[in-house]
Amino acid sequence: MDANKQKALELAMKQIDKQFGKGSLVKLSDKDIEPIAAIPTGSFGLDLALGIGGIPKGRITEIYGPESSGKTTLALSIIAQAQKDGGVAAFIDAEHALDVIYAKHIGVDVDNLLVSQPDYGEQALEIVETLARSGAVDIIVIDSVAALTPKAEIEGNMGDAQVGVQARLMSQALRKLTAAIHKMNTTVVFINQIRMKIGMMGYGSPETTTGGNALKFYSSVRLDVRRIATLKQADKEVGNRVKVKVVKNKVAPPFRIAEFDIMFGKGISREGELLDYGVKLDIIDKSGAWFSYGATRLGQGKENAKEYLKSHPELAQEIEQKIKDALGVELSHMIEAIEKDEDELNLKGE
Protein backbone atom coordinates (compact mmCIF):
# COMPACT_ATOMS: atom_id res chain seq x y z
CA MET A 1 0.00 0.00 0.00
CA ASP A 2 1.40 3.42 -0.94
CA ALA A 3 2.09 6.07 1.72
CA ASN A 4 -0.96 8.25 0.94
CA LYS A 5 -3.37 5.30 1.19
CA GLN A 6 -1.72 4.12 4.40
CA LYS A 7 -2.06 7.58 5.95
CA ALA A 8 -5.71 7.86 4.86
CA LEU A 9 -6.48 4.43 6.31
CA GLU A 10 -4.84 5.28 9.65
CA LEU A 11 -6.88 8.51 9.87
CA ALA A 12 -10.09 6.62 9.06
CA MET A 13 -9.32 3.98 11.72
CA LYS A 14 -8.61 6.67 14.34
CA GLN A 15 -11.90 8.39 13.49
CA ILE A 16 -13.82 5.10 13.78
CA ASP A 17 -12.16 4.30 17.13
CA LYS A 18 -13.00 7.78 18.41
CA GLN A 19 -16.64 7.56 17.28
CA PHE A 20 -17.45 3.93 18.11
CA GLY A 21 -14.81 2.92 20.68
CA LYS A 22 -11.36 1.35 20.55
CA GLY A 23 -11.25 -1.93 18.65
CA SER A 24 -14.26 -1.18 16.43
CA LEU A 25 -12.03 -1.77 13.39
CA VAL A 26 -8.85 -3.85 13.58
CA LYS A 27 -6.55 -5.77 11.27
CA LEU A 28 -6.95 -9.51 11.64
CA SER A 29 -3.18 -9.79 12.05
CA ASP A 30 -3.48 -7.66 15.23
CA LYS A 31 -6.20 -9.87 16.69
CA ASP A 32 -5.86 -13.33 18.22
CA ILE A 33 -8.00 -15.76 16.20
CA GLU A 34 -9.26 -18.52 18.46
CA PRO A 35 -10.84 -21.79 17.29
CA ILE A 36 -14.64 -21.85 17.42
CA ALA A 37 -15.81 -23.21 20.77
CA ALA A 38 -18.68 -25.69 20.83
CA ILE A 39 -21.26 -27.24 23.14
CA PRO A 40 -21.49 -31.04 22.70
CA THR A 41 -24.87 -32.42 21.66
CA GLY A 42 -24.78 -35.63 23.70
CA SER A 43 -24.24 -37.66 20.52
CA PHE A 44 -20.60 -37.99 19.48
CA GLY A 45 -21.76 -39.05 16.00
CA LEU A 46 -23.59 -35.74 15.61
CA ASP A 47 -20.66 -33.86 17.18
CA LEU A 48 -18.43 -35.38 14.49
CA ALA A 49 -20.94 -34.49 11.75
CA LEU A 50 -20.97 -30.88 12.98
CA GLY A 51 -17.20 -30.76 12.48
CA ILE A 52 -16.28 -28.82 15.64
CA GLY A 53 -17.48 -31.19 18.36
CA GLY A 54 -20.96 -29.75 18.84
CA ILE A 55 -23.03 -26.65 18.09
CA PRO A 56 -21.03 -23.38 17.94
CA LYS A 57 -21.02 -21.05 20.94
CA GLY A 58 -22.13 -17.45 20.44
CA ARG A 59 -24.24 -18.36 17.42
CA ILE A 60 -27.80 -19.30 16.46
CA THR A 61 -28.74 -22.93 15.81
CA GLU A 62 -32.07 -24.12 14.41
CA ILE A 63 -33.35 -27.64 15.11
CA TYR A 64 -36.37 -28.56 13.00
CA GLY A 65 -38.34 -31.59 11.90
CA PRO A 66 -41.75 -33.31 12.05
CA GLU A 67 -43.61 -33.88 15.31
CA SER A 68 -42.19 -36.46 17.73
CA SER A 69 -38.92 -36.71 15.81
CA GLY A 70 -36.64 -35.92 18.77
CA LYS A 71 -36.12 -32.14 18.41
CA THR A 72 -36.79 -31.23 22.04
CA THR A 73 -34.85 -34.26 23.30
CA LEU A 74 -31.81 -33.14 21.29
CA ALA A 75 -32.15 -29.56 22.60
CA LEU A 76 -32.45 -30.77 26.22
CA SER A 77 -29.42 -33.02 25.68
CA ILE A 78 -27.42 -29.96 24.55
CA ILE A 79 -28.57 -28.10 27.69
CA ALA A 80 -27.42 -31.05 29.84
CA GLN A 81 -23.97 -31.00 28.20
CA ALA A 82 -23.67 -27.22 28.70
CA GLN A 83 -24.58 -27.59 32.39
CA LYS A 84 -22.00 -30.37 32.85
CA ASP A 85 -19.35 -27.86 31.75
CA GLY A 86 -20.61 -25.37 34.37
CA GLY A 87 -22.81 -23.36 32.01
CA VAL A 88 -26.06 -21.57 32.86
CA ALA A 89 -29.04 -22.60 30.71
CA ALA A 90 -32.48 -21.11 30.03
CA PHE A 91 -35.49 -22.79 28.43
CA ILE A 92 -38.17 -20.55 26.90
CA ASP A 93 -41.20 -22.84 26.91
CA ALA A 94 -43.49 -21.06 24.45
CA GLU A 95 -45.41 -24.31 23.91
CA HIS A 96 -46.02 -24.67 27.68
CA ALA A 97 -45.16 -28.35 27.32
CA LEU A 98 -41.84 -28.90 29.12
CA ASP A 99 -41.72 -32.31 30.81
CA VAL A 100 -39.50 -31.65 33.84
CA ILE A 101 -39.27 -35.34 34.84
CA TYR A 102 -38.14 -36.34 31.33
CA ALA A 103 -35.63 -33.47 31.25
CA LYS A 104 -34.19 -34.73 34.55
CA HIS A 105 -33.88 -38.29 33.18
CA ILE A 106 -31.96 -36.95 30.16
CA GLY A 107 -29.44 -35.34 32.49
CA VAL A 108 -30.68 -31.75 32.76
CA ASP A 109 -30.04 -30.09 36.12
CA VAL A 110 -33.66 -28.93 36.47
CA ASP A 111 -33.01 -27.22 39.84
CA ASN A 112 -30.70 -24.71 38.14
CA LEU A 113 -32.51 -24.49 34.79
CA LEU A 114 -34.07 -21.08 34.09
CA VAL A 115 -37.58 -21.56 32.67
CA SER A 116 -40.01 -19.03 31.21
CA GLN A 117 -43.50 -19.69 29.84
CA PRO A 118 -44.30 -16.44 28.00
CA ASP A 119 -47.81 -15.34 27.05
CA TYR A 120 -46.92 -14.12 23.54
CA GLY A 121 -44.06 -13.97 21.04
CA GLU A 122 -42.79 -10.45 21.76
CA GLN A 123 -42.48 -11.26 25.47
CA ALA A 124 -40.52 -14.45 24.73
CA LEU A 125 -38.06 -12.71 22.44
CA GLU A 126 -37.60 -9.77 24.85
CA ILE A 127 -36.71 -12.28 27.58
CA VAL A 128 -34.21 -13.97 25.22
CA GLU A 129 -32.61 -10.61 24.38
CA THR A 130 -32.37 -9.55 28.05
CA LEU A 131 -30.77 -12.87 29.04
CA ALA A 132 -28.34 -12.71 26.10
CA ARG A 133 -27.27 -9.13 26.87
CA SER A 134 -26.69 -10.01 30.53
CA GLY A 135 -23.74 -12.21 29.54
CA ALA A 136 -24.63 -14.54 32.44
CA VAL A 137 -26.41 -17.22 30.41
CA ASP A 138 -24.48 -19.67 28.22
CA ILE A 139 -27.34 -21.27 26.27
CA ILE A 140 -30.97 -20.33 25.61
CA VAL A 141 -33.42 -22.77 23.99
CA ILE A 142 -36.71 -21.53 22.50
CA ASP A 143 -39.41 -24.21 22.09
CA SER A 144 -40.76 -23.46 19.56
CA VAL A 145 -40.83 -20.82 16.82
CA ALA A 146 -44.35 -21.88 15.81
CA ALA A 147 -45.59 -21.09 19.34
CA LEU A 148 -44.19 -17.52 19.29
CA THR A 149 -47.62 -16.05 18.61
CA PRO A 150 -47.58 -12.26 18.08
CA LYS A 151 -49.57 -10.20 20.60
CA ALA A 152 -51.74 -8.76 17.82
CA GLU A 153 -52.87 -12.26 16.87
CA ILE A 154 -53.69 -13.23 20.46
CA GLU A 155 -55.69 -10.05 21.07
CA GLY A 156 -57.49 -10.26 17.71
CA ASN A 157 -60.58 -12.27 16.90
CA MET A 158 -60.58 -15.83 15.58
CA GLY A 159 -60.35 -15.77 11.80
CA ASP A 160 -58.69 -12.33 11.58
CA ALA A 161 -56.03 -12.25 8.87
CA GLN A 162 -52.56 -11.69 10.36
CA VAL A 163 -50.43 -12.08 7.25
CA GLY A 164 -46.68 -12.14 7.85
CA VAL A 165 -46.85 -10.79 11.41
CA GLN A 166 -44.81 -13.63 12.92
CA ALA A 167 -42.23 -13.47 10.12
CA ARG A 168 -41.76 -9.72 10.74
CA LEU A 169 -41.47 -10.33 14.48
CA MET A 170 -38.76 -12.97 13.96
CA SER A 171 -36.88 -10.81 11.47
CA GLN A 172 -36.80 -7.83 13.83
CA ALA A 173 -35.84 -9.94 16.85
CA LEU A 174 -33.00 -11.74 15.06
CA ARG A 175 -31.53 -8.45 13.80
CA LYS A 176 -31.27 -7.29 17.42
CA LEU A 177 -30.20 -10.65 18.86
CA THR A 178 -27.33 -11.56 16.54
CA ALA A 179 -24.88 -8.89 17.71
CA ALA A 180 -25.73 -9.42 21.40
CA ILE A 181 -25.26 -13.19 21.42
CA HIS A 182 -21.97 -12.92 19.53
CA LYS A 183 -20.61 -10.26 21.89
CA MET A 184 -21.66 -12.18 25.02
CA ASN A 185 -20.85 -15.63 23.55
CA THR A 186 -24.38 -16.87 24.28
CA THR A 187 -25.68 -19.83 22.27
CA VAL A 188 -29.30 -19.61 21.13
CA VAL A 189 -31.18 -22.69 19.91
CA PHE A 190 -34.54 -22.34 18.15
CA ILE A 191 -36.72 -25.46 17.86
CA ASN A 192 -38.95 -25.24 14.80
CA GLN A 193 -41.76 -27.17 13.16
CA ILE A 194 -42.41 -28.14 9.55
CA ARG A 195 -45.27 -26.96 7.37
CA MET A 196 -46.26 -27.88 3.83
CA LYS A 197 -45.94 -25.18 1.18
CA ILE A 198 -49.35 -24.19 -0.16
CA GLY A 199 -49.74 -24.70 -3.91
CA MET A 200 -46.28 -26.26 -4.26
CA MET A 201 -45.85 -27.85 -7.69
CA GLY A 202 -42.88 -29.15 -9.66
CA TYR A 203 -39.36 -29.29 -8.25
CA GLY A 204 -38.10 -28.61 -4.76
CA SER A 205 -39.14 -29.76 -1.32
CA PRO A 206 -42.81 -29.20 -0.43
CA GLU A 207 -41.77 -28.61 3.20
CA THR A 208 -40.87 -25.34 4.88
CA THR A 209 -40.29 -24.13 8.44
CA THR A 210 -42.44 -21.63 10.32
CA GLY A 211 -41.52 -18.02 11.11
CA GLY A 212 -40.42 -16.84 7.67
CA ASN A 213 -36.94 -16.87 6.13
CA ALA A 214 -35.02 -14.76 8.67
CA LEU A 215 -34.10 -17.68 10.93
CA LYS A 216 -32.74 -19.63 7.95
CA PHE A 217 -30.35 -16.77 7.16
CA TYR A 218 -29.28 -15.89 10.71
CA SER A 219 -28.65 -19.50 11.81
CA SER A 220 -25.04 -20.68 11.67
CA VAL A 221 -26.21 -24.29 11.96
CA ARG A 222 -29.51 -25.91 10.87
CA LEU A 223 -30.29 -29.49 11.89
CA ASP A 224 -33.03 -31.53 10.19
CA VAL A 225 -34.22 -34.23 12.63
CA ARG A 226 -36.20 -37.23 11.31
CA ARG A 227 -37.47 -40.41 12.93
CA ILE A 228 -36.51 -43.31 10.63
CA ALA A 229 -37.46 -46.39 12.68
CA THR A 230 -39.15 -47.55 15.86
CA LEU A 231 -37.01 -49.60 18.24
CA LYS A 232 -38.64 -52.66 19.80
CA GLN A 233 -37.72 -55.10 22.52
CA ALA A 234 -39.90 -58.20 22.92
CA ASP A 235 -42.65 -56.59 20.79
CA LYS A 236 -42.62 -53.51 23.03
CA GLU A 237 -41.71 -50.10 21.59
CA VAL A 238 -38.76 -48.73 23.56
CA GLY A 239 -37.47 -45.87 21.42
CA ASN A 240 -36.85 -44.32 18.01
CA ARG A 241 -33.97 -44.44 15.55
CA VAL A 242 -33.27 -40.85 14.50
CA LYS A 243 -31.39 -39.36 11.55
CA VAL A 244 -30.02 -35.83 11.80
CA LYS A 245 -28.80 -34.01 8.71
CA VAL A 246 -26.64 -30.89 9.03
CA VAL A 247 -28.50 -28.86 6.41
CA LYS A 248 -26.51 -25.68 6.98
CA ASN A 249 -23.13 -25.20 8.64
CA LYS A 250 -21.14 -21.95 8.61
CA VAL A 251 -18.32 -23.36 10.75
CA ALA A 252 -17.59 -26.68 8.98
CA PRO A 253 -18.62 -28.58 5.82
CA PRO A 254 -22.42 -29.09 5.72
CA PHE A 255 -24.66 -32.01 4.63
CA ARG A 256 -23.13 -34.59 6.95
CA ILE A 257 -25.51 -37.09 8.54
CA ALA A 258 -25.61 -38.74 11.96
CA GLU A 259 -27.89 -41.53 13.19
CA PHE A 260 -28.55 -42.49 16.80
CA ASP A 261 -31.15 -44.04 19.12
CA ILE A 262 -33.46 -42.04 21.37
CA MET A 263 -34.87 -44.24 24.13
CA PHE A 264 -38.24 -43.36 25.63
CA GLY A 265 -37.80 -41.76 29.03
CA LYS A 266 -33.98 -41.85 28.78
CA GLY A 267 -32.93 -39.71 25.83
CA ILE A 268 -30.01 -40.27 23.43
CA SER A 269 -28.50 -43.75 23.86
CA ARG A 270 -24.74 -43.43 24.33
CA GLU A 271 -24.43 -47.22 24.44
CA GLY A 272 -26.29 -47.55 21.12
CA GLU A 273 -23.78 -45.22 19.46
CA LEU A 274 -20.88 -47.19 20.94
CA LEU A 275 -22.25 -50.35 19.31
CA ASP A 276 -22.99 -48.63 15.96
CA TYR A 277 -19.57 -46.99 15.62
CA GLY A 278 -17.75 -49.91 17.23
CA VAL A 279 -19.09 -52.31 14.59
CA LYS A 280 -18.48 -49.80 11.78
CA LEU A 281 -14.85 -49.31 12.84
CA ASP A 282 -14.21 -53.04 13.57
CA ILE A 283 -13.69 -52.33 17.27
CA ILE A 284 -16.73 -54.44 18.17
CA ASP A 285 -17.43 -57.72 16.39
CA LYS A 286 -20.99 -58.54 15.32
CA SER A 287 -21.63 -62.17 14.46
CA GLY A 288 -25.29 -62.83 13.72
CA ALA A 289 -27.17 -61.25 16.62
CA TRP A 290 -24.19 -61.45 19.01
CA PHE A 291 -21.96 -58.45 19.86
CA SER A 292 -18.44 -59.07 21.18
CA TYR A 293 -15.51 -56.89 22.24
CA GLY A 294 -12.33 -58.93 22.13
CA ALA A 295 -12.98 -62.01 24.27
CA THR A 296 -15.93 -60.33 26.04
CA ARG A 297 -19.41 -61.22 24.80
CA LEU A 298 -21.59 -58.11 25.17
CA GLY A 299 -24.93 -59.75 24.50
CA GLN A 300 -27.33 -61.22 21.98
CA GLY A 301 -29.28 -58.48 20.26
CA LYS A 302 -28.56 -54.76 20.38
CA GLU A 303 -30.74 -53.96 23.40
CA ASN A 304 -29.04 -56.66 25.53
CA ALA A 305 -25.60 -55.46 24.43
CA LYS A 306 -26.58 -51.89 25.36
CA GLU A 307 -27.65 -53.03 28.82
CA TYR A 308 -24.32 -54.85 29.28
CA LEU A 309 -22.36 -51.69 28.41
CA LYS A 310 -24.56 -49.65 30.75
CA SER A 311 -23.78 -52.00 33.64
CA HIS A 312 -20.04 -51.99 32.80
CA PRO A 313 -19.12 -48.26 32.52
CA GLU A 314 -15.34 -48.87 32.53
CA LEU A 315 -15.63 -51.12 29.48
CA ALA A 316 -17.94 -48.63 27.76
CA GLN A 317 -15.39 -45.84 28.45
CA GLU A 318 -12.58 -47.96 26.98
CA ILE A 319 -14.60 -48.65 23.80
CA GLU A 320 -15.58 -44.97 23.52
CA GLN A 321 -11.94 -43.88 23.72
CA LYS A 322 -10.94 -46.36 20.99
CA ILE A 323 -13.79 -45.10 18.78
CA LYS A 324 -12.79 -41.45 19.33
CA ASP A 325 -9.15 -42.27 18.52
CA ALA A 326 -10.22 -44.07 15.33
CA LEU A 327 -12.60 -41.27 14.35
CA GLY A 328 -9.88 -38.69 15.03
CA VAL A 329 -7.57 -40.44 12.55
CA GLU A 330 -10.45 -40.71 10.06
CA LEU A 331 -11.25 -37.00 10.48
CA SER A 332 -7.61 -35.98 10.01
CA HIS A 333 -7.50 -37.99 6.77
CA MET A 334 -10.69 -36.21 5.62
CA ILE A 335 -9.14 -32.79 6.42
CA GLU A 336 -5.94 -33.74 4.55
CA ALA A 337 -8.02 -34.81 1.53
CA ILE A 338 -9.97 -31.52 1.58
CA GLU A 339 -6.75 -29.48 1.84
CA LYS A 340 -5.21 -31.49 -1.02
CA ASP A 341 -8.28 -30.84 -3.21
CA GLU A 342 -8.13 -27.12 -2.37
CA ASP A 343 -4.40 -26.99 -3.25
CA GLU A 344 -5.09 -28.72 -6.58
CA LEU A 345 -7.90 -26.26 -7.35
CA ASN A 346 -5.62 -23.32 -6.48
CA LEU A 347 -2.91 -24.69 -8.79
CA LYS A 348 -5.45 -25.07 -11.60
CA GLY A 349 -6.66 -21.52 -10.97
CA GLU A 350 -3.11 -20.23 -11.25
UniProtKB/Swiss-Prot annotation:
Lineage: Bacteria, Pseudomonadati, Campylobacterota, Epsilonproteobacteria, Nautiliales
Cited SUPFAM superfamilies: P-loop containing nucleoside triphosphate hydrolases, RecA protein, C-terminal domain
Keyword match Thylakoid: no
Species of origin: Nautilia profundicola (strain ATCC BAA-1463 / DSM 18972 / AmH)
InterPro entries found in the cross-reference section: AAA+_ATPase, DNA_recomb/repair_RecA, DNA_recomb/repair_RecA_CS, P-loop_NTPase, RecA-like_C, RecA-like_N, RecA_ATP-bd, RecA_C_sf
Designated name of the protein: Protein RecA
Keyword DNA damage attributed: yes
Main location: cytoplasm
Entry similarity comment: Belongs to the RecA family.
Localization terms from the record: Cytoplasm
Domain of life: Bacteria
Any one Gene Ontology cellular component term annotated for this protein: cytosol
Matches recorded under SMART domains: AAA (SM00382)
